[in-house]
Amino acid sequence: DHRDLHSFPTRRSSDLMPVQTGELREFAIKNELFVLNLNKRQGTSIAGQNTALLKEILAWLEPNAPVYGWEQGVSEDAFVDLVSKSGHPMIPCDWSYNHSLTSLLYSQRQKSTLVRVKNPQFLDYTKKKNFVSFFLSDGDNIQWMMNDFKDFYNAAESEEVRMTYGIAASVLPMMAPAQFDNLLSQQKPNCSILEMLGGGYYYVDNYSENGDRAKNLQVVAERLSAHMRQHRVKLLGVMAMNVKSEAAKEAFQAYVDANDQLEGIVALQYSPYAGGEGDVIWVTNKAGYDIPVITVKYSLWNFGNRNAEREGTPAYIAGRLKQEAQQESFSVVCVHAWSNFSDHGQTEDPLIENQSGDIRGAGAAKLCAGHLNDSFEVVNMQELVWRLRMSQRPEQTKKYLSEVF
């Protein structure tokens, strides 16, 4: 009987699995997890959903306990929203295998592998350009990290466009420490690493709104800080339903309070990614330094026969950036991982790049960068953050660089 929940040995995690999915079965058995299918029929909600049961399980789990897996055939917010509001991170991993083995004795297998970072005091801050940084979406996706993420990560264009890659830098070291070390060892010299999305997939503005939100935000922020500091991850990517909301700002403050080594935050909105319109929100850390939360200004996304206001083809987004060019500006562009484009040279057609292409990730960023002019410079996310800090907070940034480096 599913209502006899006290008979389960652990409330520390649960599995959300599509019907007949076998990849997580051994992990669930070994850890004696409660397993639930959201859809009553595989791949569709047409036969109904076990939503009431899911809510009951989420309320029963310990606060901040992870929910592993995924569900197919429904909008992801249909279940991630419930998981997030209940105070749990979603761990997308329904297509990766053998996590009992990949995570075996993970606490004893932690290496002091460090992310490669730049020393910001050596940047030429007299240079004034329209600085643009591209980063790849979906870095919270564990199964992607375990499978073909390497094809995106090692793309030939990565160095040229100073690509920033989101990685599950707090979850992957526990679920597959060997793969985490492997990915960090392959980081290209001019590419940045961004923790995505704060220790699992959840929305920072509604996380644990059904529980003790302030306490649970502090818990996830402190857990996240430990992992980021251990591996010298200086940048954090988060997602919110409304990146400009007061609830989102409350979460930003929690992350900054917990981590005095955090240099900057990138904020995506669930829909559209660029809902923050490039606005910058400043959050003061405990040492008195203002940390920028940079919202995504545009995203490269293939919508087929149309572009959205702030999402579209490389040519379209480059055109928008050029229209807004100033003496100095700072723009974050998210590259939708699952969008492909085609190369048509210096086209003025805002849609033609959507046609039957296989250019993705850093390749798509290169297409966009190729449409920009000499008033622009493409930099990685860490450099963009420090250039923004020096531009907008020069006195405290100079003070920080003189004291820390």
Task: Outline where the language-model segments fall.
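Catalytic grooves of carbohydrate-active enzymes
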Residues: 53-69, 132, 137-163, 170, ...
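Acidic, glycine-rich loop-and-strand cores that form catalytic or ligand-binding grooves
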Residues: 11-33, 289
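Non-catalytic propeptide/linker segments at domain boundaries
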Residues: 25-159
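Long, K/E/R/D-enriched contiguous segments that form extended
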Residues: 178, 184-226, 234
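Glycine-rich, often proline-containing surface loops adjacent to acidic residues and nearby aromatics
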Residues: 130-133, 161-166, 195-202
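Short, small-residue-biased leader/transition segments that mark boundaries at the very start
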Residues: 1-13
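Soluble or luminal CAZymes and related metallo-dependent hydrolases
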Residues: 49, 175, 216-223, 313-316, ...
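Acidic (Asp/Glu)-rich catalytic clusters
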Residues: 124-126, 151-159, 172-197, 228, ...
